[in-house]
Amino acid sequence: MNLSKTGLPFLWISAVAFFTDLITKLAVVKNFSLYESINILPFFNLTYVRNHGAAFSFLADHAGWQKYFFILLALVVSFMILFFLYKNQATQKLQNTGYALMVGGALANAADRAYHGFVVDFFDFYWQQWHYPVFNIADVAICIGAGLLAIDAFKQNDKKESKQN
């Protein structure tokens, strides 16, 4: 099979997400003290926090086994997505882009977790006293990737419905 006709060439997007995330995390760790916060906008801070769990600090209060669990989970899911990219056609641009963003984000957070034992988060959106959970670029890549997959699924469903009519 000609690999250029698969979704694998979209992995450059994974590399961009991966390295952008790690570079920004390095900048935060080098320039901020833990919990230091700089106000950028009336609803947005850059705040250095450590997340020992998953999204929204899920399982953060456990004894440490979750580090290995989340690293393994990221690797397994990434390999599954790589298989999907291999099976996809290059013309499936929206789906391939979504998958690539998810791989880049998952592997960046896994690398962070393997190196530090936690994930560095720093985007802090808030309104008055309410703060959204702090997150990072890898999280953004994963969410945008999932959103693109959802949009693609709706588009595929619309195509099927229009063919049936």
From Swiss-Prot:
Record protein name field: Lipoprotein signal peptidase
TM region(s), chain numbering:
9-29, 65-85, 97-119, 134-154
Biological or metabolic pathway of the protein: Protein modification; lipoprotein biosynthesis (signal peptide cleavage)
Q: Which GO terms describe its biological process?
A: proteolysis
A Pfam family the protein falls into = Peptidase_A8
A GO cellular component term found in this entry reads: plasma membrane
Per the record, the domain of life is Bacteria
How is this protein positioned relative to the membrane?
Multi-pass membrane protein
Q: Does the keyword Protease apply?
A: yes
Q: Which reaction does it catalyse?
A: Release of signal peptides from bacterial membrane prolipoproteins. Hydrolyzes -Xaa-Yaa-Zaa-|-(S,diacylglyceryl)Cys-, in which Xaa is hydrophobic (preferably Leu), and Yaa (Ala or Ser) and Zaa (Gly or Ala) have small, neutral side chains
> What Enzyme Commission number does this protein have?
3.4.23.36
Where are the catalytic residues?
D121, D139
GO molecular function: any one? aspartic-type endopeptidase activity
| Location in the cell | Cell inner membrane
Q: What does this protein do?
A: This protein specifically catalyzes the removal of signal peptides from prolipoproteins.
- Print the keywords alphabetically: Aspartyl protease, Cell inner membrane, Cell membrane, Hydrolase, Membrane, Protease, Transmembrane, Transmembrane helix
The family line of this record is: Belongs to the peptidase A8 family.
NCBIfam families with a match to the protein in the record: lspA
Q: Which organism is it from?
A: Histophilus somni (strain 129Pt) (Haemophilus somnus)
